[in-house]
Regions:
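Conserved N-terminal beta1-alpha1 strand-loop-helix module at the mouth
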Residues: 1-41
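Short, well-ordered coil/turn segments that N-cap beta-strands
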Residues: 3-7, 35-38, 63-67, 92-94, ...
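Active-site mouth loops of central-metabolism enzymes
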Residues: 7-23, 45, 67-79, 132-150, ...
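Conserved, mostly hydrophobic/aromatic
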Residues: 11, 39, 88, 158, ...
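Short, acidic/polar
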Residues: 18-31, 53, 78-86, 146-157, ...
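Active-site pocket-lining/capping segments in soluble small-molecule metabolic enzymes
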Residues: 19, 111, 115-138, 188-240, ...
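Active-site-adjacent beta->alpha loops and helix N-cap segments on the catalytic face
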Residues: 19-21, 47-59, 77-84, 102-126, ...
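Catalytic beta/alpha-barrel core
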Residues: 39-49, 71-73, 97-99, 164-173, ...
């Protein structure tokens, strides 16, 4: 890797079982060897995984890593967010990922915060500059946005509210990211915009995720993945090459680093990162 020290970070989701929590620590140890900047931990809505998120944050912090817990608007009150912020600060947590979050089925209200912008603003009001705040960016447009320009304007509002850096939704079209960054810079946004990268491990699962979040899998990739059928080894080898090429183009194009959506697996992300270093 000839570029200057790109950043590296990983996302985990909180395991639902004690066995999963133990496995996550093993995954963490394997990825920690790559010297990432931090690990983010997702946050379940409505209490579904909130306790597990707190447990994962505690365990990963105790293992010596910088951890960035997710905060979401869904069901949150000013008091509940204030309690989380104070608790994380007491643990020495210095970074957060502030998101609107997805409404669970049947939920009609987000709570006291309607948008991630409101959440970012509240964190700054309550905690000053203690936390580095990451927010989401959508190179292929948020699925609920009315237009690319409206989506970019909303992103700029989050930055103006106090965000320090952004992580994108995953994508497989480098041009989408490069165009988004160019448009953001033209709009006066100067914070780092780090591409979020999802390894390709399972076509059915990836298709479901992508349909839900609005991420586009280019047609040529879909056709190749579908043609592998149950040949998972060949599918993953192809997926590895696709993502390595994507990351290489992104870093060459000026991306400040890579944020991996790990699905709590170390091997695929580590292999991609090592390939980029050759």
């Amino acid at each position: 890797m000839t570029r200057q020290a790109p950043s590296l970070s990983f996302e985990f989701f909180p395991p639902a079982t004690d066995a999963g929590a133990q496995k996550l620590l093993e995954t963490h140890r394997a990825l920690q060897a790559l010297q990432p900047e931090y690990f983010s931990v997702t946050f379940g809505a409505g209490g579904s995984t909130q306790a597990r998120t707190a447990e994962a944050v505690t365990n990963l912090t105790a293992a010596g890593s910088e951890v960035a817990p997710h905060l979401t608007c869904v069901g949150a009150t000013r008091d509940s967010i204030r309690e989380l912020l104070d608790g994380y600060r007491a643990q020495g947590v210095k970074r957060l990922v502030a998101l609107r979050g997805d409404l669970p089925s049947g939920t009609m209200s987000l709570g006291d915060f309607q948008h991630a912008t409101d959440l970012v603003r509240f964190v700054r009001e309550h905690s000053g500059d203690w936390f580095t705040i990451e927010v989401a960016a959508y190179p292929e447009m948020h699925p609920q946005a009315t237009s690319p320009d409206a989506d970019l304007a909303h992103f700029a509002e989050k930055v103006a509210a106090g965000a320090d850096s952004a992580i994108t939704q995953y994508f497989y079209n480098a041009d989408a990211y490069l165009d988004f960054v160019e448009r953001a810079r033209a709009a006066g946004v100067t914070i780092p915009i780090v591409p979020g990268i999802m390894p390709i491990l399972n076509y059915t699962q990836l298709s479901r995720f992508s349909d839900n979040c609005g991420a586009e899998i280019p047609r040529w990739i879909r056709l190749r993945l579908a043609a592998f059928h149950d040949d998972m080894d060949s599918l993953r080898a192809f997926g590895h090459d696709v993502v390595v090429d994507l990351c290489d183009r992104l870093l060459t194009g000026g991306a400040p680093g890579i944020h991996f959506y790990t699905m709590n697996q170390a091997g695929p992300c580590a292999a991609i990162w090592q390939a980029l270093k050759r």
